[in-house]
């Protein structure tokens, strides 16, 4: 069951709400595909044994939060002929009572009327491995996140908007932005969403029973 509730993001009430529930940023850890925490560490967070940690790179996360609204406004200007863009930081999408998502932006395709999702990302490029992870694909951490957003909102597509940032040879900050659209109708997406949904329900049963799940290791 899908529902929409009013809850201002990042308030004490919102932080309390997410306790024991699975958000988009948790999805990769549920599957053992997170770069930052294991499924067992996530379980410890959900039952209160460990303090919730979003990501360890606090300074970079702070930068991303600072430019998030600017990037969304730029996207809205650049795609004004294609999408209606809005942001609502008082809406949380909930599925089955425990799966939830709060969105960076909400999209409406002007031509078709389809509803979609805007998801912004700031990616710090500190080695060639970062480019390799994004070469013709989406890293697992972010792919799982957008699958979860599609799952919990019932929307038809996501536009992932990663902005890559690095220091160039002159010591100046350089940036490059990509736009990646993922649709429910794309090959394999519905199957991947079903797999994630089943895994999240299984994980939630471990949370409810306070039984530690088997440890899942990320693929090499």
Regions found by a protein language model. Give the residues of each.
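Accessory terminal regions of nucleic-acid processing enzymes
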Residues: 1-220
């Amino acid at each position: 069951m899908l529902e929409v509730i009013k809850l201002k993001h990042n308030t004490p009430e919102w932080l309390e709400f997410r306790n024991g529930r699975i958000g988009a940023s948790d999805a990769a850890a549920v599957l053992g595909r997170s770069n930052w925490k294991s499924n067992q560490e996530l379980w410890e967070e959900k039952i209160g044994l460990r303090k919730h940690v979003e990501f360890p790179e606090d300074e970079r996360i702070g930068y991303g939060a600072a430019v998030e609204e600017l990037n969304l406004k730029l996207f809205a200007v650049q795609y004004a002929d294609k999408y209606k863009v809005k942001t609502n930081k008082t809406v949380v999408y909930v599925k089955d009572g425990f799966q939830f998502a709060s969105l960076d932006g909400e999209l409406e395709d002007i031509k078709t009327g389809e509803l979609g999702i805007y998801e912004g990302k700031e990616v710090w490029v500190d080695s060639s491995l970062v480019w390799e992870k994004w070469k013709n694909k989406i890293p697992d951490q972010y792919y799982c996140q957008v699958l979860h957003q599609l799952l919990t909102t019932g929307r038809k597509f996501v536009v992932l908007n990663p902005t890559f940032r690095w220091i160039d040879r002159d010591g100046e900050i350089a940036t490059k932005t990509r736009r990646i659209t993922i649709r429910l109708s794309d090959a394999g997406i519905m199957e991947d969403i079903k797999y994630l949904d089943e895994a999240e329900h299984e994980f939630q049963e471990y949370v409810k029973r306070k039984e530690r799940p088997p440890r899942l290791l990320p693929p090499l």
